[in-house]
Amino acid sequence: MTNEKLAVVTGASSGIGKELAKLCARDGYHLIIAADEPAIRQAAEALGSHGVTVEAIEADLATEEGVDRLIAGIGDRDVDLLFLNAGRGLGRGFVDQDWKKVRRIIDTNITGTVYLAHQLGARMARRGRGRILFTGSIAGFMPGTFQAVYNGTKAFIDSFSIALRHELRDTGVTVTVLMPGATKTRFFERAEMMDTKVGTDEKDNPADVAEAGYEAMMDGEEQIISGWKNKLQVAAAHVTPAGTLAEQHRKMAEPVSASKD
């Protein structure tokens, strides 16, 4: 595999990450996929049908030890495409949440993601080429009432990825951030938000979201907001007071809001 094209995808056991991995396999990239659950192995088996080598690494990417395990699995191989997609959500009121759950969201969405970007981004820069895609979110554009921690982490990723892009602009490494809206994955179930309006509303297809992000990355674009409805929502957010956005978000994410229509 030393001389083959290699893509690394985190959070690839389901949802957007799994769809991104499919696109890489379609285009002949050998894959190292990672997630913190055994389902990553089933995902690898399915991807192997595309005729590429797929290695699955089960690792807790919220920890430095888990990220180090992934890096050890990569070894000294050159990474052509890096998809920083692993992430978690958390709904309900901030002060009502167990602190360990809050910390895990921050460590997964920010700490582990940034650590992996630091380690592999440096290798790409020394090599003089590579592409990085962060999965951010349009949630980063608005104060997330009843999703305060999650939206805060995505605001960080949206900002960090664009800053990193401009730091690396002369190295041959491109950085792109994918900003989806609500997508049909296990996100809202895991975040305990199935009694909310946003949790039960119609959502985007993860395959469509992944395709938009993949194409933007391969074209070297700075950012991509997937879906015209999400583009309109972000445009409106830019001219709406933060307090108004926070109240709008409350109506979507407040527990039992699904039963208020």
Predicted regions and their residues:
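Conserved glycine-rich cofactor-binding loop
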Residues: 13-14
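Conserved glycine-rich Rossmann-like NAD(P)H-binding loop of the short-chain dehydrogenase/reductase
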Residues: 27-42
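The beta1-alpha1 cofactor-binding region of Rossmann-like NAD(H)/NADP(H)-dependent oxidoreductases
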Residues: 58-69, 99
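Substrate-binding pocket helix/loop in short-chain dehydrogenase/reductase
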Residues: 93-106
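Active-site helix of classical SDR
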Residues: 117, 153
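Residue(s) in the substrate-gating loop at a strand-loop-helix junction
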Residues: 137
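C-terminal helical subdomain
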Residues: 177, 197-234
